[in-house]
Every structure is written in structure tokens, then in C-alpha cells.
Amino acid sequence: MSDEEKKRRAATARRQHLKSAMLQLAVTEIEKEAAAKEVEKQNYLAEHCPPLSLPGSMQELQELCKKLHAKIDSVDEERYDTEVKLQKTNKELEDLSQKLFDLRGKFKRPPLRRVRMSADAMLRALLGSKHKVNMDLRANLKQVKKEDTEKEKDLRDVGDWRKNIEEKSGMEGRKKMFEAGES
């Protein structure tokens, strides 16, 4: 083995060792975080949820249920209020970002997706298989027949300007122009 191969192998072995050491550290950190979250959860539950004491009589049990229902209602109201606030702020954020795009002159275009369905298949899917749908898009087009009009003939005649130039060029053309001018 040459020195270069030994160096390469040593470098790769060192890299592998460093990777494994980093992975071991990451695993221990994740385990510590999970344990900390569990402790935090237990503390929160102990703080916010009083221990359950079941009273002996039916009257006391009904009062406890009423208290719990009232607490559930208040929590639901808070949750609903926070959801409404979140929706408002999201809408406001979208409006502001749209204004920003408008001011910059850059419009965010949604990505177009290829539709692999023909118009007939799309209508069949929408209306169901009971309705027979045939969508001939050419049926509504206006029928146009090509006719030779005088304008087109005049345009073709004007298009023969090369012949007119050739006739007027040279001595013969000048002679014709001169003779036409005398008479």
C-alpha cells in the first residue's frame, strides 16, 4: 500500500468515527429532550388539572360535572377566539404580501398543471354516464368560403409591378414614355 492510500483510509476511518460520535451525541440529546418534555407535561397537568376527587353523593357529582362543562366551554371559546384571530392575521398577511407583489410589479403565478382529460371526458365525469355529451367545438365556427373578389384581383394585378418596371426599363421604355408625353 502506498502512503496516499493509507492517508485516504485513515481520513475515511476518522470521518466515520466522527460521524458515529456525532450520532451518539444526537441520540442522547434527543432522549434528554423527550424526558424534559415529559417532565414539563407532567408539571403542566399537575398545575392546571386539579386532582380528581369523587364526592359521595349524586348532587355533588352533578355539580362537579357542571363545573367541568363550564370549564370546557370556556376553553372552547378561547380556542375559537384564537382561531379567528389566526385566520384574520393570515388573511391580513396574504393581503399585505399581495400588495407587496403589486408594488414590485411581480405577480405570483400559480403553476399550471397538465390536464390529461379531453373536454368530452371532463363533461362526462361532471354530468355522469347517463347523459350523452358530445362537444364538437368546430360546430359553432362560422363557415367561410373563399371567393375571388375584385379586390383580390386588383391586388394580384398590383403585384405584377415587376413586369411594369421591366417594360419601362431600358431604351425602349424611355422611348415609349417620351412618345406618350408628345401626344
UniProtKB/Swiss-Prot annotation:
SUPFAM superfamilies: Troponin coil-coiled subunits (SSF90250). GO terms for molecular function: actin binding. One of its GO terms (biological process) is cardiac muscle contraction. GO terms for cellular component: troponin complex. Residues 97-117 are annotated as: Involved in binding TNC and actin. The modification N-acetylserine is found at S2. Troponin I is the inhibitory subunit of troponin, the thin filament regulatory complex which confers calcium-sensitivity to striated muscle actomyosin ATPase activity. Binds to actin and tropomyosin. This is Troponin I, fast skeletal muscle. It comes from Gallus gallus. The lineage of its organism: Eukaryota, Metazoa, Chordata, Craniata, Vertebrata. The gene is TNNI2.
